[in-house]
Swiss-Prot record:
Signal peptide: none annotated. Homodimer or heterodimer. It can form high affinity heterodimers with members of the CNC-bZIP family such as NFE2, NFE2L1/NRF1, NFE2L2/NRF2 and NFE2L3/NRF3. GO terms for cellular component: nucleoplasm; nucleus. The lineage of its organism: Eukaryota, Metazoa, Chordata, Craniata, Vertebrata. It is found in: Nucleus. It comes from Mus musculus. Residues 51-114 form the bZIP domain. Residues 79-93 are annotated as: Leucine-zipper. One of its GO terms (molecular function) is transcription cis-regulatory region binding. CDD domains: bZIP_Maf_small. Keywords: DNA-binding, Isopeptide bond, Nucleus, Phosphoprotein, Repressor, Transcription, Transcription regulation, Ubl conjugation. This is Transcription factor MafK. GO terms for biological process: regulation of DNA-templated transcription.
Length: 156
């Protein structure tokens, strides 16, 4: 029987990845520091080191992408909340503006009525035919309002 050196090579056992190192979970791999990772990688083959580093990089990128998605959703919700808040404020200001315009129109009408009345008084003695009924009513109402808010002094 002749011995063939080739069977010796066939008997060699190739090390599988991670065989001489404890298996790391994804959480452990991501959470360990670079120094800890380098200590763990000592003694591993170049392929194992490359595979573990690539796996760590992939897992970290997944984490970054997830946190970015969460941040983007949070910012979107905040912007939507601000948009609704500002829209409500615009509607409130539009109502106030409309109310003030109505008040301004009413005051303008009263002012014009008073100017008309003052012109008729300045032209001469007041006769019932010269003064319009609406002007008298407006003046009487205005006089009632002013007498209740500011006392009239006869000493002037």
């Amino acid at each position: 029987m002749t011995t063939n050196p080739k069977p010796n090579k066939a008997l060699k056992v190739k090390k599988e990845a991670g065989e001489n190192a404890p298996v790391l979970s994804d959480d452990e791999l991501v959470s360990m520091s670079v120094r800890e990772l380098n200590q763990h990688l000592r003694g591993l083959t170049k392929e194992e080191v490359t595979r573990l580093k690539q796996r760590r990089r992939t897992l970290k990128n997944r984490g970054y992408a997830a946190s970015c998605r969460i941040k983007r959703v949070t910012q979107k919700e905040e912007l939507e909340r601000q948009r609704v808040e500002l829209q409500q404020e615009v509607e409130k200001l539009a109502r106030e503006n409309s109310s003030m315009r109505l008040e301004l129109d009413a005051l303008r009408s009263k002012y014009e009525a008073l100017q008309t009345f003052a012109r008729t008084v300045a032209r001469g003695p007041v006769t019932p035919t010269k003064v319009a009924t609406t002007s008298v009513i407006t003046i009487v109402k205005s006089a009632e309002l002013s007498s209740t808010s500011v006392p009239f002094s006869a000493a002037s």
